């Protein structure tokens, strides 16, 4: 149950804030831990996109920039649905993470399902 609209729930304080960020401001840290964008996956996400069930991309705000930890295919699917133009994206934004913590969270939540870049 939401008490107010500052992202606080009864007894729960999530480690992120929901924020709308323009996709042109989102960085995919491929040289560090992200995998490349797979066009077929983006097209599948765009084809089946449902805003009621989509997971918000997870983003780390570090050094004044927004780094995508998870959800790059969702972001690219939204852009594809927007005719290829950048657009606002609802994101879960985490603060206070190091690059290493971002990489660890990415790897743990994705279960090492595919090879990570040489940055790890």
Feature-to-residue mapping (PLM):
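Short alpha-helix boundary/capping and kink motifs at helix termini
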Residues: 1-69, 73-98
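Amphipathic, charge-rich alpha-helical segments that serve as recognition/docking helices
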Residues: 90-120
């Amino acid at each position: 149950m939401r008490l107010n609209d500052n992202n606080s729930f009864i007894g729960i304080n999530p480690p992120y804030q929901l924020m709308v960020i323009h996709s042109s401001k989102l960085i995919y840290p491929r040289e560090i831990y992200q995998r490349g964008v797979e066009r077929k996956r983006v097209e599948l996400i765009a084809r089946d996109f449902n805003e009621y069930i989509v997971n918000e991309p997870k983003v780390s705000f570090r050094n004044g920039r927004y780094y995508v930890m998870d959800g790059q295919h969702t972001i690219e699917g939204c852009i594809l649905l927007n005719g290829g133009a950048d657009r606002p994206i609802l994101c879960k934004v985490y603060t206070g993470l190091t690059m290493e913590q971002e990489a660890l969270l990415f790897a743990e939540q994705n279960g090492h399902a595919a090879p990570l870049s040489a940055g790890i």
